Amino acid sequence: MLPLWLVLAGLLLAVGPAASHRGEMEPDSLASGDDDEDSDGDGPHGDRSEEPVYMHRAPYWTHPHRMDKKLYAVPAGNTVKFRCPASGSPSPSIRWFKNGREFRGEHRIGGIRLRHQHWSLVMESVVPSDRGNYTCLVENRFGRIRYSYLLDVLERSPHRPILQAGLPANTTALVGSDVEFFCKVYSDAQPHLQWLKHIEVNGSSYGPDGVPYVQVLKTADINSSEVEVLYLRNVTMEDAGEYTCLAGNSIGLSYQSAWLTVLPEEELVHEAETSEAKYTDIIIYTSGSLAVAMALIIVVLCRMQTQSSKQPLEPMAVHKLSKFPLIRQFSLDSSSSGKSSTSLMRVTRLSSSCAPMLAGVVEMDLPLDSKWEFPREKLVLGKPLGEGCFGQVVRAEAYGIDRQWPDRAVTVAVKMLKDNATDKDLADLISEMEMMKLMDKHKNIINLLGVCTQDGPLYVIVEFAAKGNLREYLRARRPPTPDYTFDITELHEEQLCFKDLVSCVYQVARGMEYLESRRCIHRDLAARNVLVTAENVMKIADFGLARDVHDIDYYKKTSNGRLPVKWMAPEALFDRVYTHQSDVWSFGILMWEIFTLGGSPYPGIPVEELFKLLKEGHRMDCPSNCTHELYMLMRECWHAVPLQRPTFKQLVEGLDKILAAISEEYLDLSMPFEQYSPSCEDTTSTCSSDDSVFTHDPMPLAPCLFSCPSGRT
């Protein structure tokens, strides 16, 4: 048996060199106390206990499966972290490159965080300028490896908080039970949330100013999911009522409400039994009614079939022209072969002593509408005012169209077909006429005054706007530049102030609010389709070309006609779906036109690039003359989610407050002025989307403003 001291000496000799060797190759790794998610063994020596010990080794990736994602597409404002966990012997170093150049903290506003012990690069609050190719280079004296990431930063539109639809939801509960209301909030800026309960004070739910009385139940910044839930324990009858989730950030407020109904247990059971009995009765009565209705329909159809086999088809007397089918396309060279189809109206060739023959058009024998019919002989046509896709507009004098003054001539505008019009063009003009008949008089739309449908070509008589369309009205009142000048004697009379521009926006919003109330989608709202009267009243035109949507809330355009691309909402542009919300988007573009005095939207951007930018969330910048409040209104109109855009009613209310608060400031027409890109002229026809604005012209600028002189009213 060996002495104890000899055994211990042998152990020391065996263990000592190995321990000493390990101490040279594995220095202690640095701790990371400020990034818990990185403390997972990704440090330069975090996994050393699981790997064999090498005296010398080139760098290698320790967690390659965590580096599969090469492309990072993140919204602006987020934090981005790139990681290249590696190891080697001796311990390698890591450097970062952006687009081929070494990347340091001073190269970026806001700086960067390089965590060498965790092989990571961290960038907080990324912005579009951070886009690029990021490469990590890991090396020691035995070799080097590299890996690249591609970062794309998507711009976000600043917006008020978005609340998830349907939350909070109406709830019915028993006395003594527990209730939870949920409210999901989406917001880029730090949101604040309050849960409110609506209460009564002195028997009234609203104060003298129309603001409801509420009790604040819960309020906090949203830092956890707990804040988005309202818990009501052991509810009583007094807890019944309306509850509101109110969320706000630096941009604005959003809220949604729900009702809590509290019932005694016996009442709930009774209601369930009563409801079941009612449903049974409804099913019985409905089934019987359907059986009787089906029998009647079968009898009527059989009788109609019998009569149609014995009698020739007679022309139908229908009041609404939209009930008539479209007549087939007519050609001068067509023969009367079996290709013709039966029409529900008498078809004749258009011929009139006061108008040339229209090529390729047959005339519909339209029924007389005594409410709107105007004697053709009392209409004196004048000079042309312009033309559109299928018709032309001429100035005219209508004698006696104002029934209060039967002998007085009123200046009007008359819509008629062009010489090269087709059957479809005639049907479109009739459709526009019928749409306008459905509208009541409104100050901010072009109103129908009369029609001429008998003994000649179709004339649609509408209000006359002396100052033309809004786009040209604004451009004619721009400050002079070397490339864009006008008569200096007109400056004082035509001088615009900031309040005038807001008034233009407000009036158009009022007109669209009315059209929205009549379930009319415009589909082509732009400054070129807003007319200006001699009294500077804004009137929306060409809404008759819109589709009436009584049954559905959207209209899908299926034809491949040319479209006003720059004014179209993304859902209309990419999916061809038109709603009142897509009109709101176009209204935002129109606002931009107004505050740039008729500038062309997205100047210098090709169509293909515009599609890409819209999908990425890019929006036009704020015009110089536009306040932040008005620009945020534009941005709300350009919200990517249609239902998150304001309604025209909300726009009118907001603009009314802005208009009442602002002072009148004139455009400074005496100072040097940068051009608005007058070379970026749009086509005069609303049919064309092939617009020269998509050439690379300079960005339009806006004029300076100065306080209006005293005496301005």
From Swiss-Prot:
Domain Ig-like C2-type: 59-152, 161-261
Catalytic activity reported: L-tyrosyl-[protein] + ATP = O-phospho-L-tyrosyl-[protein] + ADP + H(+)
Extracellular compartment spans: 21-281
UniProt cross-references to InterPro entries, sorted A to Z: FGF_rcpt_fam (IPR016248), Ig-like_dom (IPR007110), Ig-like_dom_sf (IPR036179), Ig-like_fold (IPR013783), Ig_I-set (IPR013098), Ig_sub (IPR003599), Ig_sub2 (IPR003598), Kinase-like_dom_sf (IPR011009)
Topology relative to the membrane: Single-pass type I membrane protein
GO biological process: positive regulation of cell population proliferation; positive regulation of ERK1 and ERK2 cascade; regulation of bile acid biosynthetic process
Binding sites annotated in the UniProt record for ATP: 385-393, 415
Pfam family, one: PK_Tyr_Ser-Thr
Domain of life: Eukaryota
Transmembrane segments: 282-302
GO CC list: endoplasmic reticulum; endosome; plasma membrane; receptor complex
Carbohydrate-modified residues: 133, 170, 202, 223, 234
Sequence ranges assigned to domain Protein kinase in this UniProt record: 379-667
Basic and acidic residues bias spans: 42-54
Cysteine-cysteine disulfides: 84-136, 183-245
Family under the similarity heading: Belongs to the protein kinase superfamily. Tyr protein kinase family. Fibroblast growth factor receptor subfamily.
Function noted in UniProt: Tyrosine-protein kinase that acts as a cell-surface receptor for fibroblast growth factors and plays a role in the regulation of cell proliferation, differentiation and migration, and in regulation of lipid metabolism, bile acid biosynthesis, glucose uptake, vitamin D metabolism and phosphate homeostasis. Required for normal down-regulation of the expression of CYP7A1, the rate-limiting enzyme in bile acid synthesis, in response to FGF19. Phosphorylates PLCG1 and FRS2. Ligand binding leads to the activation of several signaling cascades.
Record-given protein name: Fibroblast growth factor receptor 4
Species in which this protein is naturally found: Coturnix coturnix (Common quail)
Organism placement in taxonomy: Eukaryota, Metazoa, Chordata, Craniata, Vertebrata
